[in-house]
């Protein structure tokens, strides 16, 4: 099954994403910071990344760039509480394939994960 990297500094959300995705059969790796996310990308490139834009030690845009440096086709879903049009446009310009504003229903995330993985393998 596909390996998904979740880069999220809010512990409760990271745990929720992890459980939700594992229940769907995905292998999940979580990272609570930019540094942990970058290390996870280098050690074993994921099939999909879910990343927050605001991280305690830097910018989620670095996660997008690093993921694409390893695999230009890897889908990156940005999840953020900063839901302005400017934040969305900046994330998409950095290479994010999708953008979700917190809070969002679990079904929206699962649909995006499924759709992005399907798209990246075809």
Give short role names for the model-derived ranges.
Residues 39, 61-73:
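Short amphipathic alpha-helix used as the core "switch/output" element in two-component signaling
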Residues 11-29, 116:
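Two-component/phosphorelay signaling modules centered on CheY-like receiver
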Residues 33, 59-62:
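Acidic catalytic/metal-coordinating carboxylates
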